[in-house]
Amino acid sequence: MNIYFRRIINAVIASAFTCYFGVYSLVGGVNKQPPEVPEDFTPVLRFAVCSDVHLIGEEDQANAKRFTALYNDTYDYAATQSYKGFDAVIVAGDMTGGGREPEYVMFKRIIDENCREGTRTLVCMGNHEFIEYRDYDATVGYEVYKKFVSEDVDTHTVINGYHFIGVSYADDGKTFKSKVEWLKAELDKAVADTPDKPIFVFQHPHPTLTVYGSVNWSDLDIKTTLMKYPQVVDFSGHSHYASCDPRSINQTSFTSVGTGSLGALMSNLDYISGDVDMPGETAAFWIAEVDAEGNLLLKLYDAVSHRFFDDVQYYIPNVANKGTKYYSWGNLRSIDTAPQFPQDAKVSVSTDSEGETVLNFPNAKGYFDAENYRITVKSGAKTVWSDTVVSNYGRADLTEMAVNVGKLDKGEYTVTIAPYSPYSKGGKALTANMVIA
């Protein structure tokens, strides 16, 4: 898609979301800095959250290794903390590639070999748990799940005084309408027990029009049900959209959190060109900690580089308080700033093994990391290459971009690289001249 048309589309989408979330922005307030984590924050509950593992039944699959590392890395982290518990793992669907038995065997094997005493693994079914059977009988997906995981496809569990409610797709593998009454009943029980504490809900698709990816990878029945419960902190996957992106958390009438993927994080720059994989290997999961008063801390962990993201951490006090919305779409957009390159930033040029030109330049950062770069390569007045590329903000360990612009003829070129934030705020462009000999 033409880079200029993309800019128009991005502006339209940003305006549409601003209008849609306008009411929530006014209710929750804007220009409010999220609170820092108190020094005396002491968890009484710790759990990890992932989705979209997509196991294929092979132990050397990268996704299988990452799911294994989720357990081991979280145990290692917990051992360094004052509260050493690792109480639960949530898998918000798509643990398998197609719901096939060998994939479940691998899933169960990883849990059996790595999940220690005191840690519960809570699971719900995603659409991929039905894929193998849809052409003749999707209900077989339930039978296979029950054989390997649990007789209960929907669960309500209490851990350390906190409620966890998991909801699977109906046996068609597509809808939730038949699950609404059950979900309401379980939410009412949880609210009656702990009205001022967070209630953790998880299902595979995003609630419609909440987090990043919920325009086109979502379910409306889930959204309308949860809207009545401000205590809810909902975890969802399905889109694979980058959980490191600030749009992957949103507080409206409840709190929504996108879980990304243990397979590959994805992005969508304009909702027209389609979903794109983020550059390189990417995968992430959340580690959540809750104190005795119900204050919640979310920390994002890079499952590829095995480290936390430095700046992707959300402290949410008073989750059930309707007036406290530090992480609304409107507030986060209001505190966002245009990303800027470092003052001494330069573009270097290299050639890969195929003879194609690669541009190397440092990451740009504002309040949030740059989400994309709009790059133009010109020979004189003629544009010979232009595109919008997703940044490497899906990795906690990378500080530099490498962008392949293809084979260029010998000559002199001008490169312009403009950074943009997740909320489409543009920073000062980096320009450079280069010679292809």
Where are these regions (language model features)?
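Binuclear metal-dependent phosphoesterase catalytic core
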Residues: R247-Q343
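Extracellular fibronectin type III
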Residues: P422-A437
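Beta-strand-rich modules
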Residues: V405-K425
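Short acidic, glycine-rich surface-loop motifs adjacent to enzyme active sites
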Residues: A190-Y212
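N-terminal active-site segment of His-dependent metallophosphoesterases
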Residues: Y24-P102
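Active-site neighborhood of phospho(di)ester-bond hydrolases with catalytic His/Asp-centered motifs
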Residues: V49-S51, D87-D94, R120-N127, F200-H204, ...
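Conserved aromatic anchor
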Residues: G355-F368
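Extended active-site neighborhood of metal-dependent phosphoesterases/phosphodiesterases
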Residues: R100-D188, D193-T194, S218-K228, C244-P279, ...
